[in-house]
Design a protein with these regions (language model features):
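C-terminal catalytic domains of large/alpha subunits in multi-subunit enzymes
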Residues: 1-108
Length: 108
């Protein structure tokens, strides 16, 4: 379903997908499948989706549902990282280096 795909996309964006570009040319240096990290099947845990559809919403017909989980998933992972470390990491993906840099900056 769209919701599962969006959740996987959100996890990928928050934890895996790191586009690296050459600072001089702006060209992506990891644009090939062998160097651009995507989550594999074993990287994504069980996803459980509960949909609440009031009758009042069904009367409107078909509405988009694929986009919201992309945003909310990244926010949830961001909150989990902050809860675990005590600091906000300002940039996706949350690589170990970015998390450690944010922790060092917070210490001053």
């Amino acid at each position: 379903s769209q919701v599962y795909g969006a959740l996987i996309m959100s996890i990928a964006g928050a934890l895996f997908e790191h586009r690296i570009n050459d600072p001089k040319t702006g060209v992506f240096v990891n644009s090939q499948m062998d160097s651009y990290r995507l989550p594999r099947l074993g990287d994504i845990g069980e996803l459980i989706v509960h949909l609440h559809e009031p009758e009042s919403e069904r009367a409107r017909g078909v509405i988009g549902l694929g986009e919201p989980p992309v945003i909310s998933g990244c926010a949830a992972i961001s909150n989990a990282v902050c809860n675990a470390t005590g600091v906000r990491v300002p940039t996706l993906p949350f690589t170990p280096k970015r998390v450690l840099d944010a922790m060092r900056t917070a210490k001053g």
